[in-house]
Regions:
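FNR/FR-type flavoprotein reductase catalytic core
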Residues: 78-193
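Ferredoxin-reductase
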Residues: 1-88
Length: 193
């Protein structure tokens, strides 16, 4: 499916943690619904303004009932600084969904015990993945590592079997997995989006 380019409207642009924002927008194109692991490009500045490229941001959550998409992003440069300035009712350019994402039906047909592992802002697309896995009948175990305090973890508790998160320089996601390892886990297929 080809990506759509629409003008999206901001509902909220909340500070979640230092330099971390949760942007909620209305996505008017229901024919181009995103799924886990896909991303959009976001642009809140003119075509003749810097930076030259739009910012690719993964889908944190898609809510088809309200036609809203949430983007969890880190403010690290000029483009994301401009996105962080967006306020309620602001309009901006949103193009997507793009990328292959995760093939949830294939994953749940092959694996009955699944661990979702991530770190820092790389956990952003894992919420939609966890939701889709749970909706397909497999509640995964979630293991995340963060440089500083964990964020957005409460929302996982309702849809995951087990949720473990750690922080600090000595707690990468793999180490958290070893400490909180659930019985029955073994190495399996990994995915990237």
């Amino acid at each position: 499916m080809r990506a759509a380019c629409c003008e999206a409207t901001v509902l909220r642009n909340e500070v979640i943690a230092p330099d971390i924002r949760l942007l909620t927008v209305v996505w008017p194109d229901r024919d181009h619904a995103p799924h886990a692991g896909q991303f959009f490009t976001l642009r809140s500045w003119g075509a003749d303004e810097a930076p030259f490229l739009s910012r690719p941001i993964s889908v944190h959550r898609w809510n088809p009932d309200s036609s809203t998409i949430e983007f969890l992003y880190q403010v690290v440069g000029e483009g994301t600084e401009k996105l962080a300035q967006l306020k309620q009712q602001d309009a901006f350019q949103l193009t997507g969904p793009m990328g292959n994402g995760f093939d949830v039906p294939e994953i749940v047909s092959k694996y009955k015990k699944i661990a979702v592992v991530g770190g820092g802002i790389g956990t952003a697309p894992m919420y939609q993945l966890t939701r889709e896995l749970a909706a397909a009948g497999v509640k995964p175990d979630v293991f995340f590592g963060f440089r500083d305090a964990p964020y957005c973890m409460e929302e996982y508790r309702e849809i995951a079997n087990l949720v473990k998160a750690g922080s600090g320089p000595r707690c990468p996601a793999g180490r958290c997995l070893r400490r909180g390892r659930a019985p029955g886990h073994r190495a399996g297929r990994t995915g990237r989006c």
